[in-house]
Amino acid sequence: MNLMLTLLTNTLLASLLVLIAFWLPQLNIYAEKTSPYECGFDPMGSARLPFSMKFFLVAITFLLFDLEIALLLPLPWASQTTNLNTMLIMALILISLLAISLAYEWTQKGLEWTE
């Protein structure tokens, strides 16, 4: 019951904060707020340059693989359990998923930097 009350309170509080932020008007909109800031100096060039999509895709791929590898970190502690077969099967499934997704990225040329 305590857990349900805590979850309900957190959900209601988060929803209330989102609604307040959504319905409050934007105040003090003027040109200085939308201009780029470079340590107090006038900008040397345009700060609205297009972003490299290849860099973005490689960065997202790196984050996904990094998160999947982070799932492998508890394996030394999991190897001390009595149910070792389940742990090994899950680890092999995760490593296979990593290998298959790496092969897919490679074949789709998602890891190539040059166009």
Swiss-Prot record:
Read off the Pfam families from this record: Oxidored_q4
UniProt-listed Enzyme Commission number(s): 7.1.1.2
Stated membrane topology is: Multi-pass membrane protein
Localization per Swiss-Prot or TrEMBL: Mitochondrion inner membrane
Please give the name of this protein.
NADH-ubiquinone oxidoreductase chain 3
Q: Which GO terms describe its molecular function?
A: NADH dehydrogenase (ubiquinone) activity
| Keyword Mitochondrion listed | yes
Transmembrane feature ranges: 3-23, 55-75, 84-104
Recite the UniProt keywords alphabetically: Electron transport, Membrane, Mitochondrion, Mitochondrion inner membrane, NAD, Respiratory chain, Translocase, Transmembrane, Transmembrane helix, Transport, Ubiquinone
Note the coiled coil stretches, chain numbering: none
Q: Which family does it belong to?
A: Belongs to the complex I subunit 3 family.
Known function: Core subunit of the mitochondrial membrane respiratory chain NADH dehydrogenase (Complex I) which catalyzes electron transfer from NADH through the respiratory chain, using ubiquinone as an electron acceptor. Essential for the catalytic activity of complex I.
A single GO cellular-component term on record: mitochondrial inner membrane
Catalytic class of the enzyme? translocase
* Known catalytic reactions: a ubiquinone + NADH + 5 H(+)(in) = a ubiquinol + NAD(+) + 4 H(+)(out)
Organism superkingdom? Eukaryota
What InterPro entries is this protein classified in?
NADH_UbQ/plastoQ_OxRdtase_su3 (IPR000440), NDAH_ubi_oxred_su3_sf (IPR038430)
The organism named in the record is: Equus asinus (Donkey)
